[in-house]
A protein has these predicted regions:
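Short, mixed-charge aromatic SLiMs
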Residues: 81
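N-terminal signal peptide c-region/cleavage motif recognized by signal peptidases
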Residues: 14-15
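Intrinsically disordered, low-complexity segments enriched in small/polar residues
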Residues: 19-20, 186
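Serine-esterase "nucleophile elbow" of acetyl-processing enzymes
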Residues: 20-78, 86-95
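Alpha-helical cap/lid subdomain in secreted, periplasmic
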Residues: 66, 84-212
Length: 212
């Protein structure tokens, strides 16, 4: 009698599909993720929630019914050395399909060695590639007051890494807004909210081919 009761209970707890002889419902895959891994220029320094270009990217993808979601793991003040240390945990946590590496500005502003910048960018590019994530490298440029030799070497670093690691490259994140001082907050470094859609429109053609 006990065996009959147990068998009856197990059958009643089975899924409706199985109980009726049908197939189990398919398990849905998690939405693919785009990980934005940058500094204050991507973190939205001085902006309200939802105004940064990564936030606008998420809104655009949603409006287009794209399956992709955006995780913005950018941190103000981050250098490539800090990003190199932090990236493995971020990848483990988010398991992204696409990673946008947009670091290097703070290395340049602090005058850190360009050799170190390149080594860190290479290391960061290889970690997501090893996890079969697609990588977009986003470059930065410095104002001329850092000296011609340093700024030229700094500018070339991103192209060198992209070529070596066979990565798509967006040479300069702020290309569409950099020439006009009115596009920046009082600190002269961080773009205002009104420019963020222009930055996204600049990033989009380089990013879209990676959204397979």
């Amino acid at each position: 009698m006990l065996r009959i009761l147990l068998a009856s209970l197990m059958f009643s707890c089975a899924s409706p599909a199985l109980a009726n002889g049908g197939a189990a419902a398919p398990v849905s895959k998690p939405a693919p993720t785009i990980l934005i891994f940058g500094d204050s220029l991507s973190a939205g320094h001085g902006l309200a929630n939802g105004q940064s270009w990564p936030s606008l990217l998420g809104q655009r993808l949603q409006a287009e019914n794209s399956p992709y979601t955006v995780v913005n793991a950018s941190i103000s003040g981050e250098t490539t050395a800090g990003g190199r240390t932090r990236l493995p945990a971020a990848l483990e946590r988010t398991k992204p399909a696409v990673v946008v590496i947009a670091l290097g500005a703070n290395d340049g502003l602090r005058g850190l060695p360009v050799k170190q910048l390149k080594e860190n960018l290479v290391a960061m590019a290889r970690v997501p590639k090893g996890a079969r994530a697609r990588v977009l490298l986003v470059g930065m440029r410095l104002p001329p007051n850092y000296g011609a030799a340093y700024t030229e070497e700094f500018d070339r670093a991103f192209a060198t890494v992209a070529k070596q690691e066979k990565l798509p490259l967006l040479p300069f994140l702020l290309e569409p807004v950099a020439a006009d001082r009115a596009n920046f907050q009082p600190d002269g470094l961080h773009p205002v909210a009104a420019t963020q859609s222009k930055i996204l429109d600049h990033v989009w053609p380089a990013l879209k081919p990676l959204l397979k």
